[in-house]
Design a protein with these regions (language model features):
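Glycine-rich phosphate/adenosyl-contacting loop at the front of the ribokinase-like
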Residues: 1-65, 88, 272-273
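Short, electropositive alpha-helical surface patch
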Residues: 52-64, 170-178, 263
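Structural alpha-helical scaffold elements that stabilize or flank donor/cofactor-binding regions
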Residues: 114-115, 174-175, 204
Length: 314
């Protein structure tokens, strides 16, 4: 989508002009990954309008393959407006104009899952699921655990302003359970699912092989696990037992029905924040870049922090 940022601080009613740029969680991640040297293809729908032209050209300028972007002659390109963040309160105003947009018309019928599974990694966002029922159906199809799909990455990206029914954010939990790599902030897990703390989030999301919990200035924690083979049955009856979970930040494995977790935490970098827009997407891109390069968990988190710091200070 096209993003409009204010020329000066203040409420939307008082801002006289805006600067046009590009936005969108998935396209942000695509641009950062391409800048990091990866081959990236962005697949979406935009309007057959000037904003769509600007969006496609701008994303392609980062080296992203935009051949998978479809033009919709009947629906416009989505836009949103954002006010400057108040550094004292971290408050800002966001207004979306995405209802009825070209992207909101994405569905399993016009965005075939098999066409999206051609790469090594498929990155998705919970924002898309909030745009329409068709988009939600597409997201359900893409997170279904079926043979032949690529590694699926899912950033929860809870945006209350986009959900028509506030209780609908529970579907984000279902979508996350279908992914292999999941990104979620502690704050959004609390707001969307009433889950507090890393252990509670992992308990609710045991399925993903990699769960990245973002903790703002405190850093990030990643749970990684490999499935364990089924144990041989013990002879005779006996009580079931379970091992305690690991404390986030330690390297002690934690047992679960899905295998054993290794938990690693890395603190965030200290930077002077200029603009917080896009930092979460940059973090995800940095983590995924390191994942594609086969780096260990701590290095993946460090790459995420480095990319996020670059976004925060530009």
């Amino acid at each position: 989508m096209v993003t409009f940022l204010p020329s000066r601080p203040g409420p939307l009613a008082d801002v006289p002009s805006f600067d046009r740029t590009i936005g969108g969680a998935e396209s942000n991640v695509a641009c950062v990954l391409a800048a990091a040297g990866h081959r990236v293809r962005w697949i979406s729908r935009v309007g057959a309008d000037g904003f769509g032209d600007h969006l496609v050209r701008s994303v392609a300028a980062y080296g992203v393959d935009t051949s998978g972007v479809r033009r919709d002659p009947d629906r416009p390109t989505g836009v949103y407006f954002r006010t400057a963040t108040d550094r004292a309160t971290d408050a800002h105003e966001v207004v979306y104009y995405r209802a009825g947009s070209a992207a909101s018309a994405m569905s399993p019928e016009n965005m075939a899952p098999e066409d999206l599974w051609s790469g090594t990694l498929l990155h998705l966002s919970g924002i898309t699921a909030a745009l329409s029922d068709d988009c939600l159906a597409l997201m359900r199809a893409l997170t279904a655990r079926v043979p032949g799909r690529p590694l699926v990455s899912f950033d929860v990206n809870h945006r209350p302003n986009l959900w028509r029914d506030p209780s609908g954010v529970r579907v984000l939990l279902d979508l996350a359970r279908g992914a292999d790599v999941v990104f979620v902030g502690e704050d959004e897990a609390a707001a969307a699912w009433d889950l507090h703390g890393a252990e509670a989030i992992r308990a609710a999301l045991p399925e993903p092989r990699t769960l990245v919990i973002k903790r703002g200035a405190a850093g990030a924690t990643v749970y990684t696990r490999e499935p364990e083979p089924e144990p041989e049955p013990e002879p005779g009856p006996g009580p079931e037992s379970s091992a305690p979970g690991a404390v986030p930040g330690s390297s002690v494995p934690a047992a679960s029905a899905y295998g054993r977790d290794t938990v690693v935490s890395v603190p965030a970098l200290r930077v002077e924040v200029v603009a917080p827009v896009g930092a979460g997407d940059a973090f995800a891109a940095g983590f995924l870049s390191a994942t594609l390069r086969g780096l260990p968990a701590a290095a993946r988190l460090r790459h995420g922090h480095l990319m996020a710091a670059a976004a925060l200070t530009v």
